[in-house]
């Protein structure tokens, strides 16, 4: 059995693939899914990634059960629950090894690759909780309920949102892996829930920390957690930058000393050769 691979920023390949289906979920089906309190959905366990609502992300999938789940989603034109594994190294996780809270997502595109794996483009739509897993040998399937969220007090959440955006700006300056364009996009988000989720999705933190953010249903609390995570990461990044700067200075100093030593040796060799020439002339005289 192949080990499923997960999210990557690479674009969809154009050659050597089989396009299984390109789909936009019907409006009728979307409405039904959004209004349903409880329903049964296929579950896709994820390694090393937590998908948040509003995220559009490509996933590589290789495990048989996961591929079966995606095929069922495409056949039935429904959502799928994306839930992170507690242990990314587990090739065949049990249901209790998968987090109960995940993100319902629609499948935008699915491609079958030559090596038998599948690349799928998904879009997170809502938080959801697994109530119980159903007996399905072909793929993980569970009874799922959507998780309602509360905003918090208006004054507090506005202050938290401003602080989070400002802190994210500091984080982006230190983390060169995030493009400046992302900051511009984040600064324009007016929905507080989306703001917290979008920032969290860009943070290089542990899966357990992102899962904690996903499971936080009070938006003001979620923004506060995201802010705290950024504060911690910024402290680490600042220390890393100081270390890199110190190492760079030491390397430059070592290189300068090496260059001066080599230059001195060359001068000494040159002077030695000149002394030898003088001795030879003196002997000839």
Functional labels for PLM-detected ranges:
Residues 2-10:
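Short Gly/Ser/Thr- and charged-rich N-terminal loops/segments
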Residues 17-285:
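N-terminal low-complexity, acidic/polar interaction/targeting segments
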